A protein has these predicted regions:
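Short, glycine/acidic-enriched loop or turn micro-motifs at the edges of active sites
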Residues: 41-42, 77, 108, 186, ...
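Acidic, His/Gly-enriched loop-helix segments that form or flank divalent-metal centers
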Residues: 133, 141-240, 244-250, 256-270
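Active-site neighborhood of phospho(di)ester-bond hydrolases with catalytic His/Asp-centered motifs
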Residues: 37-38, 69-73, 100-105, 220-227, ...
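DEDD superfamily 3′-5′ metal-dependent exonuclease/proofreading module
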Residues: 229, 277-278
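N-terminal active-site segment of His-dependent metallophosphoesterases
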Residues: 2-86
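Active-site neighborhood of divalent metal-dependent phosphoester bond hydrolases
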Residues: 65, 78-170, 203-213
Length: 278
C-alpha cells in the first residue's frame, strides 16, 4: 500500500470515547523524511512560512525524495486565522510534500462545540472565540458568544464549511512511522499503540523527566507538542516541538530521517513577544 493510500485510512464517525484505544495510522517502512510541526494555534502565516522552509530544506537534504509533514494537533484556536489555516491544509500540498494532521485537544473541543454549539462551553474561553471570529461569526455586542444556543447554532451552520467539520472528524489520534507521533504524550502502563485518546490529547505528566518510556517504543522517539516552551527540544526519548506559536511568534518543526540526528526548523514573526502561554 502506498503512502497516499495509508494517509486515507483515517477513522470514520467522529471522536472515540476518551477511555478507549485511539485509532491511529501505522505507516510501513521504508520511511520518508518526516517534518513534525508543533502547535500552530491559528497562526496560518507562520505555518505557511515554515512550510516554505521545509520545502527548501527537503530539496537541499533529499533532492526529489518526497517528504511527509506531520502536524501534531492544536492547529486551531487562540491565534487569528484558524479557518484560513484549515483551508490551506485542505488544499493540495506542494509537489514533494504530503501532509498528515493529527488530532489535538483543541480539535476535540472544537468538534464537540461545532457539533452541538453551547454558549456555556469552556472552549469559548480557551481559544474558541478566536476560531469563531476567524469564520466571520461576530460576537454579540453585549453578550459576546454567550448568546442563545439556537442563534449560535444557526451562525455555526451558516459560516463553518462542512469540509472543515469533516476534516476535524477525520483526524487520527497517532501515527507510527519509525517514531511515534501524537499530540500530548503517552502513558507508560499501556502499549504504544493502545494509548487512550485522553492520554494522547490531554496528558501533562509527559513533562516529567523520570517518566518511563511506553512499552514497545524500543529505540524510537515519541514526538509531541501540547506543552509550550520557548524552543523545541529533545529530552531523551521525547521531542517536544510546541514553542508556543501564538504567544512567542515562533513555530517549530523537527526533521527526522533514518540514520540522521533530529534537526529543528523555525519560523518566526519579527521580534517575538515575551514568552507566556497562560
Amino acid at each position: 500500500m502506498n503512502l497516499a493510500a495509508i494517509l486515507r485510512r483515517v477513522w470514520s464517525g467522529g471522536v472515540v470515547p476518551a477511555g478507549e484505544h485511539a485509532p491511529g495510522l501505522d505507516l510501513p517502512g521504508p520511511f520518508p523524511p518526516i517534518y513534525a510541526v508543533g502547535d500552530i494555534h491559528g497562526e496560518a502565516a507562520l505555518y505557511r512560512q515554515l512550510e516554505r522552509r521545509i520545502l527548501t530544506d527537503r530539496a537541499a537534504r533529499f533532492g526529489n525524495k518526497p517528504a511527509l509533514v506531520v502536524i501534531l494537533g492544536d492547529m486551531i484556536d487562540r491565534g487569528p486565522d484558524s479557518a484560513g489555516l484549515i483551508d490551506f491544509l485542505l488544499a493540495p500540498a506542494p509537489p514533494g510534500l504530503r501532509r498528515l494532521c493529527l488530532m489535538g485537544n483543541h480539535e476535540q473541543m472544537a468538534l464537540d462545540f461545532l457539533t452541538a454549539p453551547d454558549p456555556r462551553a469552556a472552549w469559548l474561553d480557551h481559544g474558541g472565540a478566536q476560531t469563531l471570529a476567524s469564520y466571520g461569526i461576530a460576537p454579540d455586542p453585549r453578550h459576546g458568544y454567550r448568546m442563545p444556543a439556537r442563534r449560535l447554532a444557526a451562525l455555526v451552520a451558516a459560516h463553518v464549511p462542512p469540509a472543515h467539520l469533516a476534516f476535524l472528524r477525520g483526524l487520527p489520534g497517532w501515527l507510527w512511522a519509525g517514531h511515534f507521533f501524537c499530540h500530548a504524550g503517552t502513558a507508560p502502563d499501556r502499549p504504544l499503540k493502545g494509548q487512550t485518546l485522553d492520554t494522547l490529547l490531554w496528558s501533562r505528566g509527559f513533562d516529567d523527566p523520570a517518566l518511563p518510556a511506553p512499552a514497545g517504543l524500543g529505540g524510537a522517539l515519541v514526538v509531541h507538542g501540547h506543552m509550550p516552551q520557548p524552543r523545541a527540544m529533545q529530552r531523551g526519548w521525547r521531542i517536544n516541538v510546541d514553542s508556543g506559536a501564538y504567544a512567542t511568534g515562533r513555530l517549530s518543526a523537527v526533521r527526522l530521517f533514518p540514520g540522521d540526528e533530529p534537526a529543528f526548523l523555525i519560523a518566526e514573526h519579527g521580534p517575538a513577544p515575551a514568552f507566556s502561554c497562560a
